[in-house]
Amino acid sequence: MAMATQATLFTPSLSTPKSTGISIPWKQSSTLSFLTSKPHLKAASSSRSFKVSAEAETSVEAPAGFSPPELDPSTPSPIFAGSTGGLLRKAQVEEFYVITWESPKEQIFEMPTGGAAIMREGPNLLKLARKEQCLALGTRLRSKYKIKYQFYRVFPNGEVQYLHPKDGVYPEKVNPGREGVGQNFRSIGKNVSPIEVKFTGKQVYDL
């Protein structure tokens, strides 16, 4: 059975502009031509062309010793004869997502959009319409195949934003130095009485 494949070609340039579009600092090839080649069968990717650029952001510092991986545009896509549902209209006006991973062998896996595909031995790249689809596929890759993954957001203007795992360690793992968000080191019984914060605009866990 013939299988359709996705292929993308990027042409990196030498300059690297700066922007505030990325949540952590990193540098990548500044301008890349995101072109989708025409496959033999109907492929899941769109034939529109994109310019992909990666910028650095200094507002949030990355943990020491961690350098976010660069998105390699020449990475081949898994072999898939079905459709990922397209990139939706949102990809033209907002963004789409790219997940990458490296497989030790060629093996079959379940697509988050339905159906089965064959991941290639070595690096794989898959474009999806939603971040949740990347998370669903990534969870499956880690739980069943013991494969690490990364995914990125690509904006219509070509900007690439590295998303996950943000500090190099997946969130369900303990990472020394990672700061907790919304932590209160007390039991719920030690919260103040709700009547004391009524109409103040605050919550009992804020005090």
Curated annotation (Swiss-Prot):
**Residue range of the transit peptide in the UniProt record, numbered on this chain:** 1-54
Q: Does this entry carry the keyword Heme? A: no
Predominantly, its location class is: plastid
| Alphabetical UniProt keywords | Chloroplast, Membrane, Photosynthesis, Photosystem I, Plastid, Thylakoid, Transit peptide
A single GO BP term for this record reads:
photosynthesis
Q: Which domain of life is it from?
A: Eukaryota
Compartments reported by the entry: Plastid, Chloroplast thylakoid membrane
One matching Pfam family is: PsaD
Q: Which family does it belong to?
A: Belongs to the PsaD family.
What job does this protein perform? PsaD can form complexes with ferredoxin and ferredoxin-oxidoreductase in photosystem I (PS I) reaction center. PSAD may encode the ferredoxin-docking protein.
Q: What is this protein called?
A: Photosystem I reaction center subunit II, chloroplastic
UniProt organism field: Cucumis sativus (Cucumber)
